[in-house]
Amino acid sequence: MNERIADIAEKVLNGSLIERNEIEYLFSIDDGLWDLLYWANQIRQKNFGNKVKICSIVPGRLGGCSQDCKFCAQSSRYETAFQETKTLTDEQILDAAREAKQKGVPHFGIVYSGKTISEKELAKLEKLIPKIKNEIGISVCGGFGIIDYKQAQRLAKAGLSRYNHNLETSRNHFKNIVTTHDYDARIETVKGAKKAGLGLCTGGIFGIGESDADRIDMALQIRELGVDMVPMNFLYPIAGTPLGGLATMQPREILRLIALYRFILPKTGIKVAGGRVLNLRDMQSWMFYAGATSILSGNYLTTAGRAVEQDLKMISDLGLQAELI
């Protein structure tokens, strides 16, 4: 066993946060995957036990986005199946929430495409969110793009429990992926949501040409923001997007990244989200041993996921416990 990995892991297990030089060492190791996984699992078990959180999402508004995120099929700038905007009715969203609840999913997310939401859409959500909570009895999360503090306050007052807004990548690499808004707009959205009392679900996407330095930068930025959950998405190359020709990530590389993020963010939830099925393939169950504590189950926004029933069975087979409240 690599003694330096063990020493760094013991530091984390004793309650300390690791420094950048230690993080860079962990990222530099070529043959330490199994040691990383072993210790990441120890860190997960100490801070989270064997509990796993599950959530499902529904696209309240899909496609037709004005922004140019190079990985995203929903941008109107690229020739994909989602150039036109499709908006679900309140009843369709309620039906999706009922289905999620029936399948045993305790957290239900509503996600809107686009840079932000209009006043009309916000007013609609102020009525819909409490209806979902009170009539169906399920926790409601949301991702509605770039919002300000006052909008976040209104969502919190309506009963939204957590706001999803990803950084996507590091500040340095962001300009290579998005040009229609800047990194600070995302940072300010996260800070405003936190100030309003909303929980934070903030992570990014991997496999988009970023370096290990970018991955470290994003992890440290997330740590500084003090978020509650870090969704880790892995590129699902979509034909027609600028990144549609990139290769998918290898399962072992993904497990390595999950483990490294567990070292950096020992007490923060880590959710394996978009691209899980395509990229991890037969190694999906290993994500928990690598330090993950949560999964996005069911379909994603523009790609197929895995049935909730299959995920619940996987969690049970591993001797883990799905949190159903």
Where are these regions (language model features)?
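Auxiliary Fe-S-binding modules of radical SAM enzymes
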Residues: 1-31, 95, 223-325
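Conserved, mostly hydrophobic/aromatic
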Residues: 15, 40, 69, 165, ...
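N-terminal pre-triad scaffold of radical SAM enzymes
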Residues: 35-78, 88-109
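Mobile, glycine- and charge-enriched loop segments
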Residues: 48-57, 65-66, 70-79, 126-133, ...
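Active-site-proximal loop/turn and secondary-structure-junction residues that shape catalytic pockets
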Residues: 58-60, 114-116, 144-148, 169-171, ...
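Core AdoMet radical
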Residues: 77-96, 100-190, 198-203, 228-233, ...
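Catalytic cores of alpha/beta
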Residues: 148-157, 209-221, 278-290
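Conserved mixed alpha/beta catalytic, RNA-binding, or beta-rich assembly cores of soluble enzyme
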Residues: 199, 203-204, 213-216, 223
